[in-house]
């Protein structure tokens, strides 16, 4: 019985060491890091015989973020996508958009000093669905997918000391606003 325990513990330790070694090797050889998260928030407020007043409401908010980054030698390349969409219904009002975002970012850098990179970046931002100004006219959209859309590009420097934070300094940048809806473009709503 004692020999069985010793054999079992020995095999268990060897297996754990092998698994640990495999994990360490795979993370050390890849210059790519990937991470992301997704979240869903649901809320409801129901008021019955509530003396202080208020409105019943129900809402949801769906969000996701994903990053894939490359860092090897003198090269740094960070990429990020953020998507979010949420709706809210309060009282007798119809369902309204509470959150709406499509955001893409890429930043490439070449090392010029410790933690400093000469860099170029591009950012794109728009939304999924139409938006409305409910105080004016709740039936006429004031924004929609690609109306507006923003593209920002720039040259500058990236400071990346590690995993805690990154700072991008861009003294030379350009921002373009695209409105792919003729009515919104004719109203000069976005520049």
Predicted regions and their residues:
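Bacterial Sec-dependent N-terminal signal peptides
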Residues: 1-26
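Residues on the lipid-exposed face of transmembrane beta-strands in outer-membrane beta-barrel proteins
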Residues: 36, 40-42, 62-70, 104-110, ...
């Amino acid at each position: 019985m004692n020999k069985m325990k010793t054999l079992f513990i020995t095999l268990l330790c060897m297996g754990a060491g092998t698994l640990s070694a495999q994990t360490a090797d795979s993370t050390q050889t890849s210059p790519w890091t990937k991470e992301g998260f997704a979240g869903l928030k649901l809320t409801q407020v129901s008021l019955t015989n509530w003396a202080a007043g208020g409105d019943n409401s129900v809402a949801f908010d769906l969000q996701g973020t994903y990053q894939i980054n490359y860092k090897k030698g003198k090269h740094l390349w960070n990429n990020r996508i953020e998507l979010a969409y949420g709706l809210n219904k309060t009282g007798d009002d119809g369902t309204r958009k509470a959150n709406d975002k499509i955001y893409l970012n890429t930043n490439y850098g070449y090392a010029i000093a410790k933690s400093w990179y000469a860099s170029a970046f591009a950012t794109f931002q728009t939304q999924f669905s139409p938006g409305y100004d409910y105080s004016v006219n709740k039936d006429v959209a004031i924004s929609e997918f690609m109306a507006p859309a923003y593209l920002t590009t720039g040259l500058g420097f990236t400071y990346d000391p590690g995993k805690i934070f990154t700072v991008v300094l861009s003294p030379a940048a350009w921002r373009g606003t695209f409105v792919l809806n003729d009515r919104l473009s004719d109203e000069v709503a976005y520049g």
